[in-house]
Amino acid sequence: MAAVKKRKTAGRKGAGAKTTTAASAHADEVARRNAAQDDVVVAQIRDAATEVHRDILKKAKPDLAFPVRSLKNVTYSANRGYFEMGRAKKVRTLTVNTVKSFAQTLRMMGLSKELVETNDFATKRDAYYQSKNWEAAKFDEQTESDAVMDDIEAMFSTRGTSREQLRFIPDEHGGAVAGRLVVLDPDRDTGVVERIDCTRFGSGAYSIPSTVEHLSFETDAKFVLAIETGGIFQRLQSHKFWQTANCILVSLAGVPTRATRRFIRKLSDECNLPVYAFVDCDPYGISNIYRTLKVGSGNAAHLSQFFCVPQARYLGVTPQDIIDYQLPTHPLLDVDIKRGKDALKNDPFFQVHKPWRKAIEQLLSMGVRAEQQALAKWGLNYVIDEYLPAKLRNPQAFLP
């Protein structure tokens, strides 16, 4: 989905104001594309069900094939810049022993088709409770329905369809957003587009919704700054760092949710914006938070084409920053050391990038970790006045 052309937004309307004619026309185009995508999704579900029906008529055992979701079945594509699922499959064949799980899978696919056709959605929890009307096919625990939904998502991802397009949405919302961005959000019933100005939330911020496919953007920002901790995000927001740096701030709140990752990806793709990550300097911040944002994860590599942000670069905090800025540190815990060694030994992303191998090896040899807030040693606003401006003068030096 294309964004409204990147342009100056001086004099734009505040949150809640009605859209311009141009924005309304763009929203109509987005709606048309979404409707066309819905038709594709329904056709894909029908095709999968038709194959099962055809096998039954031939008196053959029908089966459904799903990608194996693990790091062992993942490769890193340097060309695309994200994890890709390998060829390993698990097959669910209809037998006496699998009849319940097979039926549950088909019922979940049927629920997805109904949601698409009625322009509705369901969370994982909703889907679990919906199954209570499925008689013998009902789920006893939500973990069972979650696993079936994840398998269906992985299966349809090979056809270019995401879980959100299947109309299953996360239970959690995304992170917070502040700065030089107007979000165009069409009402699902009336089509009237609301212009949400992310500079006008006072000391607060815009909250990313659970699904973001219908959104489009206007911005004149130069980059997106993705921030791990709420404390640093709040400091940058309250001092309007986005104004002086001409940027958009996004709070990751730890490992970013699907909605947050998709929002950043759409924003980067549609507005041609670089994304800089600012997280704690520890193996968790590097190999869980940043790596998941940039290339995805082993268990969810089937999502990477939709949710990762290949354009992301790592601003800091780096192991070298700990030395250069004489930051207060904490000793690495055993779990940190294990996570760092696992990244070097088993993670395809870090194995491909020599600068990252060097940085992780440096961190392990130092035996310490440092938080973003450690910069407050030099003053509460040192991160705003000195650290970030110095870093942003040389983005070419950021880790890949």
Model-flagged regions — what are they?
Residues 2-274, 283-400:
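Nucleic-acid enzyme cleavage-core boundary/entry regions
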